[in-house]
Swiss-Prot record:
It comes from Rattus norvegicus (Rat). InterPro entries: P-loop_NTPase, Sulfotransferase_dom. Substrate binds at K107, T108, H109. 3'-phosphoadenylyl sulfate binds at residues 48-53, 131, 139, 194, 228-233, 258-260. This is Sulfotransferase 1B1. The keyword Cytoplasm applies. The lineage of its organism: Eukaryota, Metazoa, Chordata, Craniata, Vertebrata.
Length: 299
């Protein structure tokens, strides 16, 4: 079985061509064989794109904005992460999901190619939240500083080079967002932008409710907006990941919920780094209609 320490700060493992967290790669066949249910709601995002935020919003929408119902458990139990697996420390995502009543909300960061086939066969509804890649890189760097099941990130300069090359867990941000964007044409996928959710949360939450066939009045929408605001969630121990053991996530190095803003990348990227990112973006995503906001004033 092993212990959690056995998987701390290990190099990534390659799964079908994608770099994966070492601990999550153990027993990968359980992920591939996972059986979805037609009523499952999947939240597939690239890491550090607002996944926990969206998870809490979806849970509140399904519970008609009932705050007390949404306090029933910690977010990692309410919305299990499919590939999560830390031997000796936590029940795996697959184990949690087997015991989760329908409708299940399932979080994952898996690239399209690694998502179990059964989700496509059952035409499960999916809500993808995309965040501008520069802010993702900064947030992911700080996350890897405090998350001991990830490899050590090195310096910011070293980490950004790995991020741009796709040599981080789950691979390239560019490829991830592009593939999920293109997949929405043939599958029930609601594609949202983190920056839009920051700018007009009520409007975006209404989109989510409509997608999930839920009718919510204005008062309920406003309650969800308040309860899922960054300020409220950052202080909520049920969702800010302080419930996890310090040996897994060390919040003294960087909090799980750090800033939640648009444009923090400007505090880290040099002009040269920004130009290099832009060049890769143009090469990989210029043929799409994806439109990311990277400026805090316009978001």
């Amino acid at each position: 079985m092993g212990t959690a320490e056995d998987v701390f700060r290990k190099d990534l493992k390659i799964i079908h061509g994608y770099p994966m967290v070492y601990a999550f790669a153990l027993g990968w066949e359980k992920i591939e064989e996972f059986q979805s249910r037609p009523c499952d709601i999947v939240i597939p995002t690239y890491p550090k794109s607002g996944t926990t935020w969206l998870s809490e919003i979806v849970d509140m929408v399904l519970n008609d904005g009932n705050v007390e119902k949404c306090k029933r458990d910690v977010i990692t139990s309410k919305v299990p992460m499919l590939e999560q697996n830390v031997p000796g420390a936590r029940r795996s995502g697959v184990e949690l999901l087997k015991k989760t009543p329908s409708p299940r909300i399932i979080k994952t960061h898996l690239p399209i190619d690694l998502l179990p086939k059964s989700f496509w066969d059952n035409k499960c509804k999916m809500i993808y939240l995309a965040r501008n890649g520069k802010d993702v890189a900064v947030s992911y760097y700080h996350f890897d500083l405090m998350n001991n099941i990830q490899p050590l990130p090195g310096t910011w300069e070293e980490y950004l080079e790995k991020f741009l090359a796709g040599n981080v867990a789950y691979g390239s941000w560019f490829d991830h967002v592009k593939s999920w964007w293109e997949k929405r044409e043939g599958h029930p996928i609601l594609f949202l932008y983190y920056e839009d959710l920051k700018k007009n949360p009520k409007k975006e939450i209404k989109k989510i409710a409509n997608f999930l066939d839920k009718t919510l009045d204005e008062h309920t929408l406003e309650r969800i907006v308040h309860h899922t605001s960054f300020e409220v969630m950052k202080d909520n121990p049920l969702v800010n990941y302080t419930h996890l053991p310090t040996e897994i996530m060390d919040h003294s190095k960087s909090p799980f919920m750090r800033k939640g803003v648009v444009g923090d990348w400007k505090n880290y990227f040099t002009m040269t780094q920004s130009e290099k990112f832009d060049a890769i973006y143009k090469k990989k995503l210029s043929g799409t209609t994806l439109e990311f906001c990277t400026d805090i004033q316009s978001a």
